[in-house]
Amino acid sequence: MDFEAVIGLEVHAELSTNTKIYCGCTTEFGGQPNTHVCPICLGLPGSLPQLNKRVVEYGIKAGLALNCSINKVCRMDRKNYFYPDCPKNYQITQDEVPICRDGYIEIELENGEKKKIGIERIHMEEDAGKLLHTNAGTLVDYNRAGVPLIEIVSRPDIRTPEEATKYLEKLKSILSSIEVSDCKMEQGSLRCDGNISVRPVGSEKFGVRSEIKNMNSFKALEKALSYEYDRHVEAVTKGEILEQETRRWDEANSVTVLMRSKEKANDYRYFPEGDLVTLNISDEWIEEVRKTIPELPHEKAERFVNEFGIPKYDAMVLTLTMDMAKFFEETAVKSEDAKAASNWLMGDISRLMNEKTIEVKDLKFNPEQLAQLIKLINARTISNNIGKKVLDDMFKSGKNPKDIVEEKGLVQNNDEGAILEVVKKIIENNPQSIEDFKNGKKRALGFLVGLVMKETKGKANPQIVNKLVSEEANKM
């Protein structure tokens, strides 16, 4: 019997506001423990919350970007639970009437087909504090308590771990592009829980689901869902009874581990938050927010394909972050060579950034300098290989490529006569390579080309070298 996964994701995104959702404390990441707190976010008696207007605006903005309808009348609710990281012993969230409903994200599958993943709801809520477990006991830092979140709940439309990853990547790119969240998974500002069950292919009935936590990267999400799918299929095949439970992903051992049996909604005893009034959102307010939404990543990718003629894959990669998209577009326009701009950014520049763990905004050179490098190569002033060395220098120093080329004497030699003299000398000194070539070993020419490039210290035009080596070898 063949099985399919039924997957839904719950994504928490910390909002990029300066202050917390119900008080004026800073949301800045880091800081000494328990220094970004006040009576409101500590839940002290007599303190009253006041809803941050910017949080509501960001909730509306996210909803519009994700094709949701906005609930014009919504309210905040109390979710009651007892845990050390929740100082009030309840969380102010939204239950029955969230700010957004019924949206979707469109992802592209491996076969090129597009698939809509439904979004059931988006609701606003506050984050909890952070627990630090030590040998001496458990410490609590409430700096994060009260930081504003939106929780984006997908419908169970996802069928594979790969689809789940594509959905989360697309969601992350949209949220960061509209600047409602910085989506830094390593800092916990984008967190994802997954719900998964399995059922026979063709069945409409849902199986018993597990919720998986602690998936703090795209790789962890895919591996955890794959592991849990295999675990469910094995259990069902053996006739074992699965129970609804919450599990966490153990990265070190690549397994999911039981945390607790899954709670039900009524375990939290939701009821309306009496200290906050019902929220009324006007059409005028919605339209004001709509005007602040920039070109979305998938829209930008489509424009890049049409305007610059680059492949769809390149456009999708370049628009994963708006900083990269902006850098590419400026370089493409200034260099008048969009494909070269794409190749440099997706290739050598991305490699250098990964090695140093930096982002596009941290680069020491700008699009105009990269465009200048591309023009030097296209004008045959330097070779592509020399260009890579110049880029390394630009990456370290931020110098202009023209200055680097002049300082280091890297101008390409395009003089066929001068190069021919070197080619003849190399061939004369390597008769065995000519014999190998005559005997059908084509690699022998590559060896000779390499010697010529070494002799000219990489300055000879590679195209001219290849042509002359081939011509001279065929004369022998």
From Swiss-Prot:
<dbReference type="InterPro" id="IPR006075">
    <property type="entry name" value="Asn/Gln-tRNA_Trfase_suB/E_cat"/>
</dbReference>
<dbReference type="InterPro" id="IPR014746">
    <property type="entry name" value="Gln_synth/guanido_kin_cat_dom"/>
</dbReference>
<dbReference type="InterPro" id="IPR004413">
    <property type="entry name" value="GatB"/>
</dbReference>
<keyword id="KW-0648">Protein biosynthesis</keyword>
<dbReference type="InterPro" id="IPR023168">
    <property type="entry name" value="GatB_Yqey_C_2"/>
</dbReference>
<keyword id="KW-0547">Nucleotide-binding</keyword>
<dbReference type="Pfam" id="PF02637">
    <property type="entry name" value="GatB_Yqey"/>
</dbReference>
<keyword id="KW-0067">ATP-binding</keyword>
<dbReference type="InterPro" id="IPR017958">
    <property type="entry name" value="Gln-tRNA_amidoTrfase_suB_CS"/>
</dbReference>
<dbReference type="InterPro" id="IPR003789">
    <property type="entry name" value="Asn/Gln_tRNA_amidoTrase-B-like"/>
</dbReference>
<dbReference type="GO" id="GO:0050566">
    <property type="term" value="F:asparaginyl-tRNA synthase (glutamine-hydrolyzing) activity"/>
</dbReference>
<comment type="subunit">
    <text>Heterotrimer of A, B and C subunits.</text>
</comment>
<comment type="similarity">
    <text>Belongs to the GatB/GatE family. GatB subfamily.</text>
</comment>
<dbReference type="GO" id="GO:0070681">
    <property type="term" value="P:glutaminyl-tRNAGln biosynthesis via transamidation"/>
</dbReference>
<dbReference type="GO" id="GO:0006412">
    <property type="term" value="P:translation"/>
</dbReference>
<keyword id="KW-0436">Ligase</keyword>
<dbReference type="GO" id="GO:0050567">
    <property type="term" value="F:glutaminyl-tRNA synthase (glutamine-hydrolyzing) activity"/>
</dbReference>
<dbReference type="GO" id="GO:0005524">
    <property type="term" value="F:ATP binding"/>
</dbReference>
<dbReference type="InterPro" id="IPR018027">
    <property type="entry name" value="Asn/Gln_amidotransferase"/>
</dbReference>
<dbReference type="InterPro" id="IPR017959">
    <property type="entry name" value="Asn/Gln-tRNA_amidoTrfase_suB/E"/>
</dbReference>
<protein>
    <recommendedName>
        <fullName>Aspartyl/glutamyl-tRNA(Asn/Gln) amidotransferase subunit B</fullName>
        <ecNumber>6.3.5.-</ecNumber>
    </recommendedName>
</protein>
<dbReference type="Pfam" id="PF02934">
    <property type="entry name" value="GatB_N"/>
</dbReference>
<dbReference type="InterPro" id="IPR042114">
    <property type="entry name" value="GatB_C_1"/>
</dbReference>
<comment type="function">
    <text>Allows the formation of correctly charged Asn-tRNA(Asn) or Gln-tRNA(Gln) through the transamidation of misacylated Asp-tRNA(Asn) or Glu-tRNA(Gln) in organisms which lack either or both of asparaginyl-tRNA or glutaminyl-tRNA synthetases. The reaction takes place in the presence of glutamine and ATP through an activated phospho-Asp-tRNA(Asn) or phospho-Glu-tRNA(Gln).</text>
</comment>
